[in-house]
Regions:
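Active-site activation/catalytic loop segments of kinase-like enzymes and analogous catalytic loops
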Residues: 82, 230-262, 274-293
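Structural element of the ATP-grasp superfamily
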Residues: 19, 83-87, 112, 257, ...
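Active-site Asp-x-Gly
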Residues: 67-72, 76, 199, 212-252
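Short secondary-structure junctions
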Residues: 22-30, 91-96, 261-264
């Protein structure tokens, strides 16, 4: 197995050679362009073009893309590939996600179906608030995902990524919080670290939703894990609140999830995970991708603390 080469958008010839070597480009094909496919926080994400077609190329490099000083395990690429394969094997879920076209374990590459350009953050959050049909589809996706009967061995070992995520969700953002709030976050973090429960997307927010003529699609499951379903629901609820939903969004979402065929969930736990997501997006390294004035930010901080203590 050859040592990986860490790519950039400027490496058109190198990328073309690698795609040809993998059989992802025909011998008589060539790349016509390579461009960034968005502001990925974790992975390098490129859009690669050949005559008449395009695809998304993702590489897991040994650091966090947005914060290169933060190390991240490259094995996350294999975990993400497994998630796509598991979902594509489920008839009720496969239409929700882009097709995985190829996996290169040596260079930690995934080649994905190109769903087209994604809207900017403001448009995504507005649509999350106003597109009732898409919201229904997203809830149905979570209900179906969490219903999959899978052994823990269905995913490659993900412990290093789980611990990195745990630190940036439940620990580091609470360094300046009061001791009671930090202690509650720590207890919730232990639930996350257990690795027990159904398969979760792990980062179910508007940046992972792509809207098209045939409905909404779900992307970027690189934070996937086995865990409590309330975590996915709490993350979604937090971002629905940011998009304009009322503070009761966690309760409303839990009820809609069960109406969609999801299993029994703990409403209080959804609220707490929603509070955690709000707090870590306000104080952690992955801030909300929308502009907040001081009044709105202060209101969200107070709401987050209240939800965590619920």
């Amino acid at each position: 197995m050859t040592a990986p080469i860490w790519l950039t958008a400027a490496d058109t010839a190198l990328i073309g050679d690698r795609l040809c070597a993998l059989g992802w480009l025909a011998p008589d094909e060539a790349l016509t362009d390579v461009a960034s496919a968005g502001d990925g926080n974790l992975n390098l994400v490129l859009r690669v073009f050949a005559i008449g077609r395009s695809a998304i190329l993702k590489q897991a490099r040994p650091w966090v893309e947005k914060y290169p000083t933060i190390a991240a395990p490259v094995e996350r690429s294999a975990v993400e590939a497994s998630f796509y394969q598991l979902v594509r094997a489920a008839p009720a879920l496969r239409t929700f996600m882009p097709q995985l076209l190829g996996v290169d374990p040596a260079w930690h590459l995934l080649l994905m179906e190109d769903l087209g350009e994604q809207a900017d953050a403001a448009a995504l959050y507005h649509r999350a608030s106003t597109d009732a049909a898409a919201r229904t589809q997203l809830i149905a996706f979570l209900a179906g995902l969490h219903a999959l009967d899978l052994p823990l061995a269905a995913l490659p070992d993900n412990r290093a990524m789980l611990e990195l995520n745990h630190a940036h969700i439940f620990t580091l953002p609470f360094a300046g919080a009061d001791s009671d709030l930090a202690a509650t976050a720590a207890r919730l973090g232990q639930r996350y670290l257990l690795g027990a429960g159904p398969l979760l997307h792990g980062d179910f927010f508007p940046g992972a939703w792509v809207y098209g003529d045939d409905g909404v699609k779900v992307i970027d499951p690189e934070f996937c894990l086995f865990g409590p379903p309330e975590f996915d629901l709490g993350v979604m609820a937090a971002h629905l609140i940011v998009s304009g939903d009322p503070p009761e969004a966690p309760d409303h979402l839990g009820a809609a999830y069960q109406s969609a065929g999801g299993g029994a969930v703990d409403s209080a736990l959804i609220r707490r995970f929603a509070g955690i997501e709000l707090w870590r997006r306000l104080f952690g390294v992955a801030p909300l991708p929308v502009v907040l004035d001081h009044r709105r930010k202060d209101a969200l901080i107070a709401l987050a603390a209240g939800l965590i203590r619920a």
